[in-house]
Structure formats: C-alpha cells, structure tokens
C-alpha cells in the first residue's frame, strides 16, 4: 500500500485513471486483513493522493465534481465508485480533450421550497431519537450552522482580519498538509488547531498564537444555533435521555463548550472530540470509545449530516442513525451561482437556514425572503452612498415603489432627510402635458390602441371630455383612427393645460412644502424609463421655477426589448439618472436577460409594492386622489415580511462582518435572475394575483 501511494506522484493522466480502478481493488483486499484500522489509514492516504491527482489539480474538474457529489449525496454515499468514475470522465473531457467549460445553470424550484429538506417534524425527530438510551449529536451543519454556504468561506473573514490575501487557500492547504504529516508520524489524520497554525505561521509569517486566537474568536462569534435542531435537542433532554456531542474537529473542547453554551445547547453529558481522543467518526473508532464509556449493552443513536462518518460508520459500530441532510448541499442548485464569493456565500446560507431549518412558510413570503430582502437592503445602501456623494438635502421615495425602501432606509440611515412622495406615471403625464406632449399622447392614447377602449373611457382617464375634441364617445380606438386622435390632442395642448389648472395649483402647493429648504433632491423609484424623476425635474424647474437640482436612482432601467429602450439614455449618460442593478452600460447580462414581455417587470415591481391604493393624481384645493382599492394588499404584506426577515438576518451577520453591507447591484439582482430562469416558478407563485397595468389602465391577472 505504501509503495502504491508513493508512485502516484509520477503518473501521467491515463495511468491516474487506471489507479482509480486499482484503488477499489485495494479497498476490498484491505477490509479482509486483520490490521483493519492501520490499513484504513493507509487507504485514506492513497485516496487523498488520488483525489489530488484526479480532482484538485484541475479547477474545472473540481468545480463540476464537487457540484455532482453535492447534488447526488445519497448515491455518492452508497456507491462512491460512480463518483470516481465521473471524475475520470471529467478529466478526459477537460484535461485530455480540453473541452470548453460550460456554466452550470442555476435552477429554481417551482413553488414553495421551505421544509422540503428534512421530512420529519421536531416532535417526530425527537421521538425517534428517544428510542435509544444514549443520543449522540453531530455539531457543525447539524446543531450549529455557520453563516456561509461552505465552511471554508469562514477563512475569507479570518484572512481579512489577519491581513493575508488568499488566506482561504492557504488555510485549507495547511490543514491538508497537517493531516498528511500527522498520518506519517502517528498514523492518524486527527489534527489540532495548533498543528494547523504551526504551518500557517511558517508560510505566512504571522504568529501561530495570534492566528489561532483570531480563528477561535471568529468562529465562535459567527456560528449560530440551528433552530430546528435546538428544538429537537431540548425535547430529547426533556425526556431524560443521556445526550452526548460527537464531532470530528480540530478545535479544542473548551471551544465547543463555549460554542454550545452560547447557542443554547446545555445539559449534555460529554463531548467526544476526535482531535483530543486521537480517533474519529471518519474511521469509526470514536463510536467504539463511546460504547466503552457507557456500556455495550446500551442502545445508541447518532444524528448527523455526513453519510459516511455520521451514518455508515456509526451503523457499522452498532449505532442506529438519523440522517440530517446538509442544507447547503441540498439547496446548492437552487441558489444563484454568479454572486460574489463572500456575499453570495452569506446570502445562500441565510436563505437555506430560513427555508429548511424553520417552520414552513408561504411561497409569497419565500419570494420576498429569497429575492426581495437582499435587493431592498443593497438598494438602500446604494441610495445612501449616492445621497452622500451628491450632497443631497432630501431623498424623495416615490409611491408606491418606494414604500418598503423608505421604511428600511429610515431605519438604517436616520441621519438623512426623507419623504414618501405621492407621484405616479399618470399624474406626471398630466402635469407635464405641455412639456412632454409626445409622452402624454403615448401614455393615454397610443398604449391603449387595439385594446377595445372607447374614446369616452380614454378621455375620462385623462380627466377630459372627448366631445371637446369632436370625438364620438362610443367609438373604439383602433390603428385606423389613431392618427386622428393623436392630432386632436396635439392641437389642443393649451386647452388641456387649462383644464388641469386646479391640478397644477395643488401639485405646486404639495411640492413646495416637500422641497422647502432643499436644493439638491434625490428621487427613488423601482424603474424603468426614469420618467418619474425626469418629469418631476421638469415640473419643479420649468413650470414651478423652484430652481432645484433633481437626480434620480433606479433599481433597473428599460431594456433592449422595449420600444422606448433608449428613452433615458442621455440622462443615464450625464448622471441625472443612476442605475443600481442594470442598464445598457451596467451588468449587461442582466440587461439582456430581463424581458418585460415575460412579466419580469411585474414580478420585480411586486418586490417594491405598497399596501395602499395607487395614487391617481391631484385634485382641487390640495386634494390627493387615490384608486378605490388596493390590489394584492395581503400579498404585498407577505412579501415585505419576508424581505424584512432577511434584512434582519443579514444585518445580524453584517454586525460582525461590516464590509458585507456594501452589496453590489449584480449581487442584489442575482436571486431574482435565478427566480426568472424557471418560467414556471413565479407564474405559479402569483397565479391568483393581479397587477395594475398602467399602460392599459386596467387591473390585469398576472
């Protein structure tokens, strides 16, 4: 076995693939020999070298292999030879034949994700565990969760504190090498944190003690209880069972004592720790130690997330087991694959915890948590940075898209003046009829062509009488008579303006009060053309002569699939409009994949809704006019509930890692992009919902 292990270093590609077969032959030979544990260690050494040769040396192979294993965890545990065969095929494809790598496309569950990872309730799980005398709990990814999709992502944070670039790679390599050294010297893979940081210190120049202290404190600070397992744990304790903690880990026992106490896991009998006992779950000997401690006649059960260490090995040593799926592996395919490393990792971990470790939630709430929370939080930070850089005196959040944004913004940034402003596309078009008559005609006339509208309906929405334009009330607007109606409106703009006299007075009074004492204003809207900001700027300065500077921010802009895709390009170019997520010059992949005709605008706007009716415009004597009803009021509240819960969860982590608060527009939009990548997902979520179609003026079923 030793000779076989040593020759791997000099093998070429084809020889390596052959070794994959020899590995399994060696395995079956070993298990029949008497010195079982010594041979297991030798086999693990060969396996590690083979893994490095087949998988670790090619990033593309490693990426696809790890994705495959995580997606087929059950199959991998039962038949690892299939996974190794897949690794061989990947090497042939990417190392020998050099095929181009294809991106693994994210996929989205079509419906409610929550509660689907682990089928049993907390009561059912506790009852099953209580069938034994001694109940053993795994720690990480079972009792305790890290706020990262991958455990190694914690090393990003430690590296930042230590001031060492690429520390994640360095730290992982040092741990791997420490295990090799331990195996060569003591025939064991169980290492301590000190063993690891002895190598880290040698390779980075930092003090080993300082590095260990930093990792110890960072891990302790960031780790949190799995709420589902905390409930199970307390129920088992309440039944009077002997509870023990069993873990393969390099941290000392005092770390686990502090970690478990901090997160509410008290009352256990003992911690069985691999690095202090010299044996682990990975080779099965830790289970034998437990039985020697409590007696072989007792009934034992262990719950954990690793099919090999926690399930297969435990069963081989007489334990009953409960498999608790690793939530981050289970949900890997359903999270965005194109977010930045740290923020993407934290985002995925929080979503996985919320959906799989807590009580099931509605699909609407889930949509708000998954897609809206990070978008609202990131957008608020973008708004704040923009306000500071532009010396803004006051921020105007447009109704209704600005409702949840203002609520969160005011909570996070109380030092900035804000106002929730009743402003809508309809009101803006009327008040700017003489400034932008083409837009007025487009909104009220052209967009209703061929939709079975009568002239009476159209001009009533304009608060005018069609008879004043010599048009028959019952006549339907068609392509055939469109030009006649357009010209009738263009030729009567002064008359239209005079009809809106009371509206102008009310609007001027309203905005003078809002803008009093402010010279630099920032408007906030969801999207798309930016006409709300453009028209407010024109109204305040060209009609009301207020002499104020108006800049607008948008979550997203018009895309190339719209007829007026370049409506505001000059405003975007000169900085009068600032996009957050995408525009023709920002994050082009999102710009090109956002399709309004596939209802992407509607789904996006639902993340920014408000639980009150639409603003219709200004009446006389300062009157504000609203629609008679609010569509989707409960739906909006449920979405906001999910968004606020995500924000609370994220800010809890952000309090310990401050720099993850600066969320890029790309990261903020990525979960929504993943959601719309499955055409059935959102259409199913919103099957019974309606939206206010501003183009047609009607409420339409989504």
Predicted regions and their residues:
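Asp-based phosphoryl-transfer active-site loop
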Residues: 128-148
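Conserved Lys-Pro-Asp/Glu-containing loop-to-beta segment of HAD-superfamily phosphomonoesterases
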Residues: 282-308
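Conserved phosphoryl-transfer catalytic core
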Residues: 150-185, 333-338, 441-459
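Substrate-recognition/cap helix-loop segment adjacent to the acidic, metal-dependent catalytic center
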Residues: 237-244, 249-275, 414
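Short, acidic loop-to-helix structural element flanking the phosphoryl-transfer center
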Residues: 118, 186-245
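Short glycine-rich phosphate-binding loop at a beta-alpha junction
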Residues: 136, 248, 392-399, 521-524
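Acidic, divalent-metal-coordinating active-site segment for phosphoryl/phosphodiester hydrolysis
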Residues: 306-321
């Amino acid at each position: 076995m030793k000779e076989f292990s040593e020759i791997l270093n000099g093998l070429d590609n084809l020889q390596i693939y052959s070794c994959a077969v020899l590995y399994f032959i060696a395995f079956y030979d070993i298990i029949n020999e008497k010195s079982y544990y010594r041979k297991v260690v030798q086999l693990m050494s060969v396996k590690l070298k083979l893994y490095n040769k087949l998988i670790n040396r090619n990033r593309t192979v490693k990426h696809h292999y790890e994705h495959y294993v995580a997606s087929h965890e059950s199959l991998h545990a039962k038949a690892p030879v299939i996974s190794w065969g897949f690794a061989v095929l990947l090497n042939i494809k990417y190392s020998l034949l050099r095929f181009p790598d294809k991106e693994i496309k994210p996929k989205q569950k079509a419906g409610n994700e929550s509660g689907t990872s682990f089928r049993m309730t907390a009561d059912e799980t506790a009852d099953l565990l209580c069938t034994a005398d001694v109940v053993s709990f795994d720690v990480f990814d079972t009792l305790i969760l890290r706020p990262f999709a991958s455990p190694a992502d914690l090393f990003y944070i430690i590296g930042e504190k230590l001031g060492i670039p690429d520390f994640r790679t360095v730290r992982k390599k040092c741990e791997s090498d420490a295990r090799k050294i331990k195996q060569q010297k003591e025939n064991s893979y169980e290492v301590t944190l000190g063993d690891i940081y002895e190598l880290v210190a040698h390779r980075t120049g930092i003090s080993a003690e300082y590095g260990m202290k930093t990792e110890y404190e960072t891990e302790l600070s960031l780790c949190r209880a799995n709420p589902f397992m905390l409930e199970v744990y307390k129920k088992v304790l309440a039944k009077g069972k002997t509870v023990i903690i069993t873990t393969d880990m390099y941290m000392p026992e005092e770390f686990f004592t502090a970690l478990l106490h901090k997160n509410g896991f008290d009352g256990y009998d003992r911690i069985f720790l691999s690095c202090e006992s010299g044996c682990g779950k990975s080779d099965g000997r830790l289970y034998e130690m437990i039985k020697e401690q409590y007696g072989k006649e007792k009934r034992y059960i262990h719950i954990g997330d690793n099919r090999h260490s926690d399930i297969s090995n435990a069963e081989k040593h007489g334990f009953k087991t409960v498999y608790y799926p690793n939530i981050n592996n289970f949900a890997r395919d359903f999270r965005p694959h194109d977010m930045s490393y740290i923020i993407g990792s934290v985002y995925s971990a929080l979503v996985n915890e919320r959906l799989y470790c807590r009580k099931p939630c509605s699909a609407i709430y889930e949509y708000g948590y998954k897609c809206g929370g990070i978008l609202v939080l990131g957008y608020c930070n973008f708004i704040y940075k923009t306000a500071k850089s532009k010396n803004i005196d006051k921020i105007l959040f447009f109704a209704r898209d600005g409702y949840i944004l203002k609520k969160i913004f005011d909570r996070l940034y109380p030092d900035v003046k804000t106002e929730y402003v009743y402003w809508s596309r309809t009101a803006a078009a009327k008040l700017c009829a003489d400034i932008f008559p083409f837009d007025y005609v487009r909104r009220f006339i052209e967009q209703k062509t061929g939709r079975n509208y009568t002239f009476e309906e159209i001009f009533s929405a304009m608060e005018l009488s069609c008879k004043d334009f010599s048009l028959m009330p019952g006549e339907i607007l068609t392509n055939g008579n469109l030009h006649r109606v357009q010209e009738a409106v263009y030729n009567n703009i002064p008359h239209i303006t005079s009809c809106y006299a009371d509206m102008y007075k009310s609007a001027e009074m309203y905005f003078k009060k809002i803008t009093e004492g402010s010279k630099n204003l920032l408007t906030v809207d969801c999207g798309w053309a930016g006409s709300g900001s453009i028209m407010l700027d024109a109204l305040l300065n060209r009609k009301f002569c207020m002499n104020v500077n108006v800049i607008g921010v948008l979550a997203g802009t018009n895309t190339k699939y719209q007829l007026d895709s370049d409506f505001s390009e000059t405003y975007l170019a000169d900085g009068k409009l600032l996009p957050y997520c995408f525009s023709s010059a920002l994050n082009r992949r999102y710009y090109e994949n956002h399709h309004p005709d596939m209802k992407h605008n509607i789904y996006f706007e639902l993340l920014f809704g408000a639980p009150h009716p639409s603003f219709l415009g200004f009446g006389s004597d300062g009157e504000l006019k609203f629609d008679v009803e609010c569509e989707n009021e409960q739906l909006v509240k449920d979405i906001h509930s999910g968004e606020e819960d995500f924000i609370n969860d994220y800010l809890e982590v952000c309090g310990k890692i401050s720099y993850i608060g600066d969320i890029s527009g790309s990261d903020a939009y990525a979960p929504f992009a993943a959601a719309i990548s499955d055409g059935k997902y959102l259409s199913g979520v919103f099957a019974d919902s309606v939206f206010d179609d501003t183009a047609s003026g009607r409420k339409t079923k989504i």
